[in-house]
Design a protein with these regions (language model features):
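Terminal-appendage/accessory-domain detector
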Residues: 1-53, 150-163, 170-392
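Function-dense linear segments that define catalytic or interfacial modules
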Residues: 34-48, 52-73, 88
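Glycine-rich, mobile lid/loop segments that gate access to catalytic sites or pores
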Residues: 69-167, 181, 185-188
Length: 392
């Protein structure tokens, strides 16, 4: 999907304003924002805040990067924009609540548009009044549905949220005014979008930061599958598991994931990212789930993987938290082994570093991954300059 969008936007032409991942030439701000956001979410590495159930980084960082290029902002202003944007998206996501999500909205994009708007507004140096107008403008474009999970449209929704947020900030800068009381008013955003109106989302503004609770992804698939992945990796590593030793696998998950990442028979690589059974089969058969090529169309028809899938049973359990799961493996020799894992548990920094570096190395290689980790590129230069120098 990112290749299609990239080719479409390149064909549109326009000013060479902003950095695009994978392109030598720059593109107009809106094009760059769209491509980078779609690419970031399609890769499925973007992190999650489980309080809001949203992925904020692809939307906000893409918007902030493009606007920074337009304004020639240094890395300090860029970083501030990213932080306030992500914090905004998280807090609005929490305010919307589970009701909004279970109604069918893709909260990453519905709440995320406000993150991209605020990030862009900060980098543009908008006043409080104009920032409020930008948020009001953005509310008219907030969209995204969970029905698109497993399709190319899911990352597109993220791209739309990033782009519309940037547009909203520029419109407000030029003087477009909106109703700024859009969240709580009768027939406003909250009631229209099935919000829970959770005021706890706005407690301790400027004192407590929800961004500190963002959890990183270590695998290139839906974050709802990651506690299962970590549980199974533990069992594979500690019991030398392989398919020939396994009689069956039972996986206990929070019921909400039956509708999110439990595609029984994925038809393409994107759907594999939302399939407990196929991801388990990949791990048992020694595939690396940090690699993008693991989630290929061809693997949907891999006979070894399909054989392993038939051994897996997914069981919904109300006692299992949203961030945890339990994997039980019944071996052919009669033994039963199990592991429970909660991805909300805080990791040691050394463990976090190891996992992030392994993921990055799978995508970018060892040399660039080391530069990303050790380079001090948050100096006074334009953020995209470092990216162009090291990633293109």
């Amino acid at each position: 999907v990112s290749k299609i969008i990239k080719n479409l936007e390149k064909g549109n032409g326009g000013k060479k304003e902003a950095f695009v991942i994978g392109l030598i030439d720059r593109l107009p701000i809106k094009s760059a924002t769209l491509i980078n956001a779609v690419t970031g979410h399609a890769l499925d590495y973007d992190d999650t805040h489980f309080g809001s159930l949203g992925h904020t980084s692809s939307i906000v960082i893409s918007a902030a990067l493009a606007v920074s290029d337009k304004k020639k902002s240094n890395a300090k202003v860029f970083k501030e924009g990213v932080l306030v944007g992500i914090e905004t998206a998280i807090r609005i996501g929490i305010w919307l609540g589970r009701k909004h999500y279970h109604q069918g909205f893709h909260i990453t994009s519905t709440a995320g548009i406000f993150g991209s708007t605020v990030a862009a507004a900060h980098i543009l140096g908008l006043s409080k009044k104009k920032t409020m107008n930008a948020i009001g403008i953005a509310s008219a474009s907030s969209s995204g549905i969970k029905a698109q999970f497993g399709s190319m449209v899911k990352p597109l929704q993220v791209g739309f949220a990033a782009t519309r947020g940037v547009e909203s900030a520029f419109m407000a800068e030029k003087g477009i005014k909106a109703d700024t009381n859009i969240f709580d008013k009768l027939d406003g955003y909250g009631t229209t979008y099935s919000a829970e109106f959770k005021d706890c989302a706005f407690v301790n503004l400027g004192k407590k930061y929800f961004i500190n609770d963002v959890k990183f992804k270590f695998h290139a698939c839906c974050h709802g599958t990651h506690s299962v992945i970590e549980s199974l990796i533990y069992l594979i590593d500690n019991y030398q598991l392989k398919d020939s030793l396994i009689n069956r696998i039972e996986v206990f998950i929070n019921p909400q994931y039956l509708k999110i990442c439990n595609i029984e028979k994925p038809k393409n690589g994107i759907e594999i990212k939302f399939s407990f059974k196929m991801i388990i089969a990949l791990l048992v058969n020694k595939f690396n789930t940090t690699r993008l090529d693991t989630f290929s169309d061809a693997n949907c028809h891999n006979k070894k993987l399909l054989k392993t899938c038939n051994k897996v049973k997914i069981i919904a359990d109300d006692k299992i938290l949203e961030t945890e799961s339990e994997v039980m493996v019944i071996l052919k020799d009669g033994r039963t082994i199990r592991k429970k894992y909660d991805i909300s548990d805080k990791l040691k920094f050394s463990t976090l570093e190891k996992k992030l570096f392994f993921k990055s190395k799978s995508l970018l290689g060892k040399r660039i991954s080391k530069k990303l980790w050790y380079d001090n590129f948050f100096d006074n230069s334009l953020p995209s300059n470092w990216l162009e120098k090291n990633l293109q």
